[in-house]
Regions:
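Carbohydrate-active catalytic/glycan-binding domains of CAZyme proteins
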Residues: 1-287
Length: 287
């Protein structure tokens, strides 16, 4: 419990306080191994990072290593995209963060990167905080840098959106770009479809177009992975057998002047008695 909005001074470090990432690995999508990593402990030069978040995983074919790319900023400076390499066991960072992409305008942040390889090109979709936040694309011949800026907006949203992610339709040369429309209530996802990463068709939002939600609402910062039929069946069978019930509780923190139910207090100070007097309203029920 703390009395300040953030753990560190907001003017100096901005919102958030996340200095690392959680790495998790599984062979069956049920049992997971976890490792915590801290960027600020890798070197003294990273001790003053403001926040690190929105990680994604890719494989760098040129160096033969798993690569994590993510959003990070130093202190309360603008946000940029960085990458690191991790070991084969996926429990330890093996390199210092390197710059993956920064917005050409030095006053604008770039966050929430998502990379898709098509042919010999790497397509980086990201959020540009250039006016109203939205989705832009940059393309490179290599996964770890040299992305060429494209000024075009690739979302169809009149509202702010973030967290782009791309997946390929099975059996088709079509890709779907999904993004989080966080600026509406309740939150929703919106979708576009492309076959060439130049022209995009607007598919609308969940339940407002061809995409339908099932057992969820108000989704947030999502991602999509392909499953085989066997994998999907195993997951369904496991969770039908191992249903979980979550019960949340909240601690009640009070600092009452006196017990009972009172409201609308007025406090007066008496010069004659040199005491303070409280005059509240009451429901008439003691205790």
């Amino acid at each position: 419990y703390r009395e300040t909005e953030w753990e560190r001074d907001r003017n100096m470090y901005g919102w958030g306080n996340n200095k690392g990432l959680v790495l998790m690995k599984s062979w069956d999508l049920v049992n997971w191994k976890r490792a915590n990593t801290r960027f600020d402990q890798l070197t003294a030069g990273l001790s003053e990072i403001g926040c690190a978040w929105a990680p994604e995983i890719a494989y760098d074919e040129r160096v033969g290593k798993l690569m994590i790319y993510y959003t990070m900023r130093f202190r309360n400076e603008r946000n940029k995209l960085y990458y690191v390499y991790v070991n084969d066991d996926f429990d330890r960072i093996e390199s210092l963060p390197q710059l993956l992409y920064e917005y050409p305008d030095e006053t604008v942040s770039a966050i929430d990167g998502d990379i898709t390889k098509v042919g010999d090109k790497y397509h980086l979709f990201y959020v540009a905080h250039d006016g109203q936040p939205g989705i832009k694309q940059a393309v490179s011949d290599r996964i770890s840098g040299d992305y060429e800026y494209d000024p075009r907006w690739y979302d169809f949203e009149p509202k702010s959106c973030e967290a782009p992610t791309v997946w390929k339709r099975l059996g088709e040369d079509k890709w779907v770009l999904m993004y989080d429309v966080y600026s509406i209530t309740p939150h929703n996802f919106a979708f576009t479809e492309t076959s060439d990463f130049i022209t995009f068709k607007n598919l609308g939002r969940f339940n407002e177009g061809v995409m339908k939600s099932t057992n969820f609402n108000a989704p947030k910062h999502g991602a999509v992975v392909h499953l085989t039929t066997e994998e999907a069946d195993k997951l369904e069978a496991y969770w039908l057998k191992n249903k979980r019930k979550y019960v949340s509780t909240a601690s009640i923190q009070r600092n009452p002047l006196f017990p009972g139910y009172y409201a609308d207090p007025e406090i007066l100070y008496s010069e004659q008695t040199q005491k303070y007097y409280v005059y509240p309203t009451t429901d008439g029920i003691p205790g």
